[in-house]
């Protein structure tokens, strides 16, 4: 699965992988045969796809015991763990890619998690919903309440999201940490966003390294 070269309504069109456009981007980035660790991997769907279609050595970490069992049933190597506690079980530079897809905003210590990703991996792929999207801003402006949008569908009291970041926030963090941003992708639905991504992108995907 790669980014399609076609245009829809004049905008570059991004395909889907397992129902998600950010997975399509991740599926494009990861090189065949790579060693991959997916943090917060859920039931292992992405790892299963990468193993079958890219021939990767796929490993995962997931906090939910039920999801770990379902991932193992898929034939994916996943262990139960809390990524906020670090990745002490893995040596330095053990993986080619460490993936964190729409989970960063749910971690208690996002900076520690990012640093651990780049300790155990040569590159990190980080995807997150953009809290700076215009619909989020408009919702807060017009209602004066915590926003509920397609990407942030939860009420404030039951949301798994505890750190709300924007595209510009992550760019600033990368500079602060001295990270090299190798690739950036900005998505709105299935369209790639070019101009004003902090305002127009619903989801961002970054490929970074030390």
Predicted regions and their residues:
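Conserved alpha-helix/loop element of class I SAM-dependent methyltransferases that forms part
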Residues: 17-33
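Class I SAM-dependent methyltransferase SAM/SAH-binding core
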Residues: 49-86
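A short SAM/SAH-binding and catalytic strip from SAM-dependent methyltransferases
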Residues: 97-108
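S-adenosyl-L-methionine-dependent methyltransferase catalytic module, highlighting the catalytic core
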Residues: 111-116, 123-210
């Amino acid at each position: 699965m790669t980014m399609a070269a076609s245009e829809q309504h004049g905008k570059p069109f991004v395909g889907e992988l397992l129902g998600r456009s950010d997975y399509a981007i991740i599926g494009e980035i990861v090189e065949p045969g790579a060693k991959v660790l997916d943090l917060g991997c859920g039931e292992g769907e992405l790892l299963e796809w990468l193993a079958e279609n890219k021939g990767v050595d796929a490993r995962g970490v997931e906090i939910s015991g039920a999801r770990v069992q379902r991932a193992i049933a898929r034939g994916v190597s996943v262990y139960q763990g809390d990524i906020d506690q670090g990745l002490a079980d893995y040596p330095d530079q053990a993986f080619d890619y460490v993936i964190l897809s729409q989970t960063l905003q749910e971690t208690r210590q996002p900076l520690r998690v990012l640093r651990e990703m780049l300790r155990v991996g040569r590159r990190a792929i980080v995807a997150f919903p953009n809290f700076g999207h215009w619909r989020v801003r408009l919702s807060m402006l017009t209602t004066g309440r915590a926003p509920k949008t397609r990407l942030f569908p939860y009420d404030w009291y039951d949301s798994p999201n505890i750190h709300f970041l924007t595209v510009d926030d992550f760019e600033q963090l990368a500079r602060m940490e001295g990270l090299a941003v190798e690739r950036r992708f900005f998505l709105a639905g299935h369209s790639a966003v070019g101009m004003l991504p902090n305002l127009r992108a619903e989801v961002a995907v970054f490929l970074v390294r030390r």
